[in-house]
């Protein structure tokens, strides 16, 4: 196999794995006789990392707040090359949010393969940019919410909020506690978002979606995202959420080194389901899109391997760049790039094997194959 190590395409190399970590990448002909060898065909790359996954395998995190539910979601996405993800819990009651965090605490303690932490998307968002989120559950952030958001002692916690609704002090407190804070479902103006970035805002959830568009005299959240160098942007590259031209413009403005592919996947990923229920509303799966009856997008019918293929085929990006957007760049955003996102000595053996059409042949998490 060719090896993409996170920076370069390498030929004629072996990847040596011991105790779930990468030991080295020696020339294949230099392998000692005592090493158990497996020959694989295709392209071996760092496993994909997806920071926005609402569900998969028929399970929606909001509905199934259990370790087994989390395990099902992770397993469904693993089939598409995702070796690390943040199961994502969207706007809901305080009680169910606490249950989701507790289930994640248990899943992390149980070392469920592929689970890196939790993404809490809402409920501290803008009602006017709610998208498919239930307005009945949108609310201001209180002290008891901060306790839930900072409850996890291991793994990553990512919170998507509207900075104009929460204020800068809450963002600074979350960031100081190690929580990753993203702006999303926001109607905040440019100045508010830039100031939030100075107070610890780390990124932007599904850039362009659920936020005002960039305008000449009012750049808004999109302008702030593209004009703040040390922030990261999640991109849904499915041909439905954002036009290909708008994605290319964003990458031309900010570069790809702070752009990460996300799926925003729902329960249908990895299944042949034609729809599902979300807070009592039916979501329909048609022509690669998930929508309510009135046509509102409700997450995406996307997996990471498809996002990689779309980025190469639709956006015309080079494969090394795209593979970084699917692995190393999200690892950096999560502050896990010391052990994820590269095939290098000391890194976790989280790997994906792709065929020539960029479909997934096999994955490894901590050196264990699926």
Functional labels for PLM-detected ranges:
Residues 1-32, 364, 369:
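N-terminal metal-binding scaffold of metallo-dependent hydrolase/deaminase domains
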Residues 54-56, 71-100, 114-126, 153-164, ...:
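Divalent metal-dependent hydrolysis catalytic cores, especially in the metallo-beta-lactamase
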Residues 67-68, 100-103, 142-144, 216-222:
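Charged helix-capping and loop-helix junction motifs
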Residues 120, 174, 204, 311, ...:
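Conserved, mostly hydrophobic/aromatic
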Residues 126-152:
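Conserved phosphate-binding/catalytic loop of the ribokinase/pfkB sugar-kinase fold
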Residues 146, 150-271:
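Active-site core of metal-dependent hydrolases
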Residues 223-233, 251-263, 269-347, 351-354:
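His/Asp/Glu-enriched, well-ordered alpha-helical/loop segment
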């Amino acid at each position: 196999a060719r090896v993409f190590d996170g920076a370069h395409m390498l030929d004629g190399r072996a990847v040596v794995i011991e105790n779930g970590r990468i030991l080295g990448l020696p020339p294949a002909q230099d392998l000692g006789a005592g090493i158990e060898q497996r020959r694989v065909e295709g392209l071996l790359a760092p496993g994909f990392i997806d920071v926005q996954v609402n569900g998969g395998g028929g399970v929606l995190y909001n509905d199934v707040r259990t370790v087994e539910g989390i395990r099902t979601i992770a397993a469904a996405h693993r089939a598409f090359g995702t070796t690390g993800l943040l199961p994502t819990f969207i706007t809901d009651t305080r009680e169910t949010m606490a249950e989701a965090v507790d289930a994640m605490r248990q899943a992390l303690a149980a070392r469920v393969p592929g689970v890196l932490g939790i993404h809490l998307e809402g409920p501290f968002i803008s009602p006017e940019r709610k998208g498919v989120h239930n307005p009945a559950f949108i609310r201001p952030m209180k002290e008891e919410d901060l306790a839930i958001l900072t409850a996890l002692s291991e793994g990553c916690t990512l919170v998507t909020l509207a900075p104009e609704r929460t204020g800068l002090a809450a963002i600074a407190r979350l960031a100081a506690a190690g929580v990753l804070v993203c702006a999303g479902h926001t109607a905040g103006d440019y100045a508010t978002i830039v100031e939030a970035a100075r107070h610890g805002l780390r990124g932007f959830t599904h850039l362009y979606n659920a936020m005002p568009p960039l305008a000449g005299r009012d750049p808004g959240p999109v302008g702030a995202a593209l004009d703040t160098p040390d922030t990261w942007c999640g991109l849904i590259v499915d041909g439905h959420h954002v036009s290909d031209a708008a994605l290319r413009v964003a990458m031309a403005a900010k570069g790809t080194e702070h752009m990460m592919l996300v799926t925003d996947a729902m329960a249908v990923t990895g299944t042949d389901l034609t729809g599902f229920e979300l807070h009592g509303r039916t979501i329909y799966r048609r022509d690669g899109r998930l929508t309510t009856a009135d046509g509102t997008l409700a997450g995406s019918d996307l997996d990471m391997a498809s996002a990689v293929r779309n980025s190469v085929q639709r956006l015309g990006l080079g494969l090394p760049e795209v593979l970084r957007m699917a692995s190393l760049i999200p690892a950096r955003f999560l502050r896990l790039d010391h052990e994820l996102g590269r095939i290098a000595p000391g890194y976790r053996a989280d790997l994906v094997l792709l065929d020539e059409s960029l479909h997934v042949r096999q994955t490894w998490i901590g050196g264990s194959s699926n």
